[in-house]
Amino acid sequence: MDIRLELLKSEDEEQFIRDNQAAFNYGAEQYFTDEELKEQYEEEGQIISRETIVSSIHRKGSIAYRIIEGDKKVGGIIINLKNTFGDLEIFFVVPNSESKGVGQAAWREVEKLHPEIKVWETVTPYFEKRNIHFYVNKLGFHIIGFYNEFNKDIQIPEEMDGMFRFQKKTGQ
């Protein structure tokens, strides 16, 4: 499998956003009825809003990559780096390319490109069992928190309700 990462080009940003939304919608559609799905939307018809993606792409310290297989765009990753800490903000594989090792190969590339990062963190919603499996069993992350009505904290934003937080230490 020929997987590589390319920096997101400004002329591809709009398609990146659409692909990201399609992938996140696809994941949620596997778990919710149409009525339940509406309760999960950040914006009309979208699990992840355009604003969330755009702000992640353009946040200080962020790097956005396209995941490329051969000559085809099959996903995307947005990371935010600060010294030896990395925040995996967005990670998606387009629906027809999932479950083929694309995500694992892409993550290996991220770690190769950023060996200075010693601790990675990310979050995913409770209903995304495939993501939880992927982060824990395939990439070696550990669950370090579950934010819900029983684990409220003024420092945890309301939109984190129902989210697992993961961490991966890559070195000392």
Regions found by a protein language model. Give the residues of each.
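Hydrophobic adenine-recognition pocket in adenosine-nucleotide-binding enzymes
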Residues: 8, 91-93, 124
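A conserved beta-turn-beta hairpin within the catalytic core of GNAT-like acetyltransferases
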Residues: 81-89, 98, 116
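Conserved GNAT acetyl-CoA-binding A-motif
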Residues: 113-126
